[in-house]
């Protein structure tokens, strides 16, 4: 890139992979500029801000090397089911509590605590080949939700103790007629920290060892469906008209997950 300017000190703002020209904007407008989270990225948005001094020179002045940084965090996960639970199968994975917007050039001064500023990533339904193990990568904007110093055991890094808008991975599995949900919060450690910074990389190696709901990160329910159609059945068909009922019974020990 070549451009002409008078000698002096300048603040240089650079954006990459946005797919659009930002146009002419003041310094304050650039600092306030936000971008929207995307479900998929062909290229990751990047940015940089640097102060440069241009000295008087009759020739060409070469600026210092400028490094752009990603405005997103990379979340990689590797999930496997332990051999001791051969009847437990993975069903889906979803990244939840994803910030919808972020400023392009400046890190967040404070995290949002309003749920309307967050969304969930699309549900990743797992194929039959991934019932016992799966891997994937997701991207999200920074979400520095802080720390909770009272958490001393990773089993207590759960919805009861986490900040309301902290980001987490929701894993759905099945064991027999039980549906299980495993909630794994992001952060810089396995206990107190719920911070996700821009231009960071997080790798979650998760081993599911069972459906023990003593671990407060695990929620499950058993669903049974019965009917009284038998008296009106002919082969595989039910004869109409008749009065019959379909019974749905849900058994669980906790109020979560919410069922609709």
Placement of each model-derived feature along the sequence:
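Tryptophan-paired
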Residues: 1-25, 78, 83-198
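Structured interaction patches on ligand/partner-binding surfaces of diverse proteins
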Residues: 20-62, 179-194, 198
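Solvent-exposed, conformationally flexible loop/turn segments
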Residues: 47-49, 53-61, 129-136, 197-199, ...
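Interdomain boundary/hinge segments at the C-termini of tandem beta-sandwich modules
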Residues: 54-56, 67-70
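Outer-membrane beta-barrel proteins
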Residues: 65, 159, 236-238
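A short, Gly/Thr-enriched small/hydrophobic beta-strand-prone motif that recurs across taxa
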Residues: 69-82, 240-248
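Exposed beta-strand and adjacent loop surfaces of beta-rich binding modules
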Residues: 74, 87-92, 166-168, 213-215, ...
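Low-complexity, acidic Ser/Thr/Pro-rich "mucin-like" tracts of secreted and single-pass surface proteins
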Residues: 185-260
